[in-house]
Every structure is written in C-alpha cells, then in structure tokens.
C-alpha cells in the first residue's frame, strides 16, 4: 500500500483507494505543479503577484495621466504604439524590447493630469518582423474593442479610460460567505429578450435579473462575455481575453449589471474560455508577433481540428501570466465570483477527447495521453483563485470523468469545486429520441443521476445551451414539437402530447434537481419550456435573429400554458432553498420498479415519489421511509397551478407503519397518479 502523504499529491488516495496503481502519476503531476509554482515564487514574487499581470502589462495609467504600454511579442524586431492620438504615426512612440521579449513605451501626459491618449480612441501596436515586414495588431491586454460594419468586420482596439465621474463605482463586493445549494441560471446577455436584436447589459440588468431572483436561482453563469468577433460562436471563439463584449454595451454597464446581481444576493460566474482561442489574426492573438508559436503550440499541436481554433502552450511562462492574470482581472475589475471553465476535457488530454469514449477505466486518465502542462495550469489557476478569494466557485466542463478533478490541489487534486454532469442531459435526449415511455428503465435513470464520484461535487442539469443549439432542440420541443405552435393556449384543447409534455418536463427537471447532484443548472428560457432551438444570425440563416432570443413574453401571456412550467420552476427552487437537499448527503433510493415505472427516494428529510408510468395511477401504493411519523404533502407536480389535474389532496395526511419495506424501517401508503411527482415531509 502506498504511504499517503499530504505533500506529494497522493492524499487523494484517502478518498479513492482505486487510484493506488496510479500513485506514481499523481506524484509526477503534483511535482510538476510544485516545480512551476516554485519558478513563479522565485522569479515573480509568488502566485498572487504573478497573476496581477493586468496591472503591469497592456496600458497602465499613472496619476499624472502618463501611459505606460507593455506587450509581449518576442519575434518582433521593432515595435511602436500607433493610434488616433498620434495620427497613426510610426515614429512618434517607438518601443524598447526587454531580454524577455516584452516591448515597452511611455506616453507622457499633455499636461499634468491630462492623458495624451483620449478616452475610447483607437490604438494599435505596429511591429516589424525579422524579414522586414510590418504588421499591426490590437494590444492583447486591451479592455475594449468595437466593430463598425460600415467600415470593416475587423474589430478596433480602444483605449478605455473614462473620466472619474463616468467610471462605475461598485457598491457591493464579492460574497462574504460560501454559496450553499448552488442553483445556476445559465444566461447569454445578447439573446435575453424577445426582440429580434442583440440585448444589452442594461436591459439584462433591468429586465432579466429580477426574473432570476424571483425564480429562486442564487447564481448566474454568464456566457459570451469575453469578446468574440464571431457572434454565432456563442462566445466560444474568443479574440480579446480582457475585453467585455461591446455588442452588449460598455465595460461600465457590465460592472453595473454584476453589482446589481450582488445587490439581489446572486453569485455571478463567468464562462471562461481558456481551452482555445479564435484563429483570427487582425483582431485576435493568433500569429500575434508574426510567429506561429507566441501564445500557442506550433504546428498541428497548436490547432484544434474540430473547433478550427488555436491551442495554448500552457508550459510557456508568459502564457501562464496571461491566463492567470485574466482570471484575476475578471474577479477584481468586474467583481465576478468565479468561473465555469469551458472545454476542460480538451485541455487535459492531448487527443482533446476526440474519438475517445472514456469507459471509466482509470488508465484513461493517466499516462501519455494526458497533457501535463495543461493539468498544471488548471491546478495553478484553482490554487491561485482559492487562496486569493475564499468563496470563489470554479466549475469544470469535463465529459471524461477525470478522477480528482474536484479535490483540493493540496491533496493532489485539480482543485475545482464542481464538475458538470454532462451525461445527464444526454440520457434524456436519448430516451426521448429512441424509446417509448413504457421502455424507460427506472434503474438506468437512477444510475445516470447518481453515478458521480464520491466527495467530488457535481452540477446536475436536464439541459444547457448545448442541447438547444441548431441541429438539436430544447427538451420541451423534443416532448411536444410542433403541437407547441397550436396547443399551448389554455383556450385550446389539452392534447395528449401537450399533457404528456407538460407532465414530463416538470418531472425530468425535478428528478434531476433532487437526485442528480450537489448543484443544479438551467439554461435561460428552459424554466418555462422554451420552444424550438438556438441559432445565431449567420450567413446560413440570412442573419436572422428569430432563434437568437428568449421569448419571455410566452410566460407573461397568462393565457398560455408556459406559465405552468415557469411556476413549477419557482416552486422547485424555493423548496430547495427551504430544505437544502443540494447540500445534503446523496439520496437513499428505496425503489426502482420497472413494471410500475416508480422511483422513490429520501433526501434532506423529504420523501420523493415519482410515477413515470404513462397511464397507470396507483391507489394505496406502499413506499418505504426511514423516519416514522405523520407525513403531509409538501409539493406535487399535479397541482392546478402547475398545469396538473389536481388528483392529489393537498391536505392529505400519511401515517407510517413500523414495518420494514424496501430496506426502510417504516412504510406508508399513497395515491400516486401517473406522470406525477409527490413530495412528502414531516
């Protein structure tokens, strides 16, 4: 047996003895992390200081109005700062190069306190390459870029330095306590209204934040904030890592949005994309200094075949400074509370998860296929964030099931707080596409919902933005399809398809919420069964906004049945807020009955009874429960206010009998209508 040590990366063996054969790989990984961290400690004054690169790189404005500009571009032989402020002169502001390839210049103030570079004016760096060629680029640490389609689709870098009276002053800081029972509302600002146009930060703040609060979510995950030239990339082809997308408004307006969310008690996470970058050259960071390998791996290793994008070289010192400082920047300047890391699977493996099924065998997670440099970056990122911000939240998007992903770095883990349970939405889509309701296997549903790593927290969700993208469709549309166009009004007949769709949409969300993890996520609009799919304006659809919006008006129209699904979401979230099952130990499942299509489990002192049978209701159905007493109805999806048939007496009382049943000490008998969930409590 390997001796467990807190200092060599094998402490994770305490929580998972199956890692024993891979203790050598764990030691190697932790040693690589310690080596990189030691280099940073010795040469940069520590991880905390190293990750403050945004305070030294890019544009730094001193108290007298002078501007110092620094840029890493080791391949360039000459460099100069050009812009509207110097009439794009290639001689006015030359830069000098350090031995480490960092260029620098100082622009003195026009007069004391008066900056020579006007606020929001255009700037670029112009560089000469070894062959004599001259290239212009947008500064990599730029905080604002804009696009004027009347001139060009290429973005322009802008010097953002508003007068003090125009600078947003935060009234609220980061959360002072850990978030319990994380209920995440995944949102994209640009699609957040029924209008066929891009929604703004201000509109989101005024119109959407109150909805999120009222729905009972306590966290927002904001997509597509990092600037991306191609809107239809959903924000995943980032061009400018320190710039908040100008499509939606100004940096100050985003700060106001985050501050308002904090005022409402909401945690705000940024969907951060450090797994790859846009291959754009003129308005991105690709080929930045004329070389193929400044921020990225050279050649094929630096390119993602499926995403058509560039891949970072996580072993490069300046790349680590850039990415770690990027995290600090969003935390410090915009007051985000944490991150959902995109594409972690692609980062962790040299094959990027392409063509790998991941059987769950531990040999797949260690060895030559793992990108050790990327793993070290993720460990450094999580260590820096958790050491600097006590209540930060980090979530990994990983489909592989990497062990130790959500264990602390000090134990030898990768350091994330949560992982996304990506197999859960896949299961529902497969069931709805390939099986009739009477073919659903209760055991398989329970297995998929509870199959998660011991002591590694997961975010459960029935569907996210991924499921809604063009080529797929929302859960509601899988259930009800074209009948949603004609039969979602209370004035129209309740067809069998709509009746089934409403019932199952509620049950699917609720069983995921209660059984699936330690946190819950919903993509905006799906709380009320948003129809159709997501498709951003692009050439292939005539640049249409028809599917790049969220039709909140469907809920506001009280004649439509969407209100029932919405109200159930409200009830579900606020019930969790009261009983806190997401913070409770994993549920005890006492029944998975294939013939009856019944699932029964206990969690957080509540008894959950799901009847997935398409037609069969059960009278005096016996279910086991551990705690004796008189149980009452806490919630049922069959209530009229949720579009149900009101078949359950809300004032009913259920008394336990002290006799063992399904492995529990007591039993009680209930009426369980078909396609209904019943929640009982003492």
From Swiss-Prot:
Q: Entry's InterPro entries?
A: A-amylase/branching_C (IPR006048), Branching_enzy (IPR037439), Glyco_hydro_13_cat_dom (IPR006047), Glyco_hydro_13_N (IPR004193), Glyco_hydro_b (IPR013780), Glycoside_hydrolase_SF (IPR017853), Ig-like_fold (IPR013783), Ig_E-set (IPR014756)
* Enzyme class of the recorded protein, top EC level: transferase
What GO annotations for molecular function exist for this entry?
Answer: 1,4-alpha-glucan branching enzyme activity; cation binding; hydrolase activity, hydrolyzing O-glycosyl compounds
Q: In which pathway does it act?
A: Glycan biosynthesis; glycogen biosynthesis
Any transmembrane segments, and where?
Answer: none
Question: Cytoplasm: is it a keyword of this entry?
Answer: yes
User: Which terms under GO biological process does the entry name?
Assistant: glycogen biosynthetic process
Q: Which SMART domains match?
A: Aamy (SM00642)
One GO cellular component assignment for this chain's record is: cytoplasm
Residues at the catalytic site: 342 (nucleophile), 397 (proton donor)
- The protein's site described by Transition state stabilizer is found at 466
What's the stated role of this polypeptide? Answer: Glycogen-branching enzyme participates in the glycogen biosynthetic process along with glycogenin and glycogen synthase. Generates alpha-1,6-glucosidic branches from alpha-1,4-linked glucose chains, to increase solubility of the glycogen polymer.
Q: Which family would the database say this protein is a member of? A: Belongs to the glycosyl hydrolase 13 family. GlgB subfamily.
Q: Which PANTHER family match?
A: 1,4-ALPHA-GLUCAN-BRANCHING ENZYME
For this entry, the protein name equals: 1,4-alpha-glucan-branching enzyme
Q: What species does this protein belong to? A: Cryptococcus neoformans var. neoformans serotype D (strain JEC21 / ATCC MYA-565)
